[in-house]
């Protein structure tokens, strides 16, 4: 056990939308410390979303994140030689980071030409409750539902 609780690092809002959420997303998107590249990918993706839908890109991004945010997850626990998948509620900060990481991960796996195009298409799909990221959330919830019987085991 640690002696003190870890301090949360302050997150500065991004320059264009003045949003901490965007900064957190860009920090997750960043590879090898290249923040300016990550920012341009994100802004390009948001612009593409706005152009294709005719609505505010940031609002669609927020809607997409809300749609792919999980409420419960399963965690493995050994009880008497057997490993059980136990459903657990997720705290808010972890929900958000899981949603962001899923959105970025499944965007990277898509087959479009540029990362900004992949991200834009995955955001639009998630906003419409489709796509690989939304499927991942549904699968997570399905696993938790299937293992509801073991929810009396606690950590």
Where are these regions (language model features)?
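Strongly charged
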Residues: 1-32, 36, 43-155
